[in-house]
């Protein structure tokens, strides 16, 4: 599931301050940004706040956005920077327990119990990843960005993106195996676009 780019006319109008055009952009990207942030921070309320802050920063920075890069690349770069700022601030505060059990797993509604348990186990394994691995994996598998877009968004090389996604998937698979969770192997195309 790749994210589409906003219509250039809508983007240009939003850059000139057209509130309707900006609302169109927010509606198109609010859910993917929120889902990404939620999986990184593990707290629905904080994810909602951060998503709003991301779009405030996007609104403020939109007049300076140039079409040299894709809008989604820039949007997730803004998102990454805001989340990293928040994670650094959280590190300086007394520790609080983040529990993935409070987060409804994607696609778990109306699924058999075993499938829901497997999804929960996957998200627990993802939650245990380092922030760098988690960001790359979520941008690819949840948001649907290409490897190139991830490299641009995270400001890292394409090789680093490939390694982080490979390593993240390897660590998730190892965690699932340790927990005795059987997950069917799905052949993945070697697409790096």
Each language-model region and where it sits:
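C-terminal edge and immediately downstream basic/flexible tail or linker adjoining helix-turn-helix-like DNA-binding
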Residues: 2-3, 13, 95-98, 123-124, ...
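Short, charged helix-capping/linker segments at alpha-helix termini
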Residues: 3, 13-24, 34-53, 158
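Internal acidic/polar
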Residues: 3-7, 85, 93-119, 146, ...
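Sigma70-family region 2
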Residues: 15-16, 39-44, 53-70, 89-91
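Short amphipathic alpha helix immediately N-terminal
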Residues: 26, 128-147, 153
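Structural recognition of an alpha-helix C-terminal capping motif at a helix-to-coil junction
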Residues: 35, 49-56, 69-81
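Arg/Lys-rich amphipathic alpha helix in sigma70-family domain 2
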Residues: 60-67, 77-98, 115, 167, ...
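DNA-recognition helix of helix-turn-helix
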Residues: 80, 84, 88, 133, ...
């Amino acid at each position: 599931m790749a994210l589409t780019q906003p219509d250039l006319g809508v983007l240009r109008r939003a850059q000139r301050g057209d509130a309707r055009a900006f609302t169109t952009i927010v509606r198109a990207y609010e859910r993917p940004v929120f889902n990404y942030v939620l999986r990184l921070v593990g707290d629905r309320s904080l994810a909602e706040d951060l998503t709003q802050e991301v779009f405030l920063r996007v609104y403020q920075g939109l007049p300076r956005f140039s079409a040299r890069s894709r809008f989604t690349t820039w949007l997730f770069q803004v998102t990454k920077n805001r989340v990293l700022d928040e994670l650094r601030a959280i590190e300086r505060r007394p520790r609080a327990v983040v529990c993935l059990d409070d987060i409804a797993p994607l696609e778990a509604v109306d699924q058999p119990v075993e499938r829901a348990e497997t999804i929960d186990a996957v998200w627990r394994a993802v939650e245990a990843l380092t922030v760098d691995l988690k960001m790359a994996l979520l941008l690819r598998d949840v948001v649907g960005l290409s490897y190139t877009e991830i490299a641009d968004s995270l400001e890292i090389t394409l090789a680093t993106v490939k390694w982080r996604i490979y390593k993240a998937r390897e660590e998730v698979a190892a965690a699932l195996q340790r927990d005795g969770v059987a997950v069917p192997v799905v052949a993945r195309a070697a697409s790096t676009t």
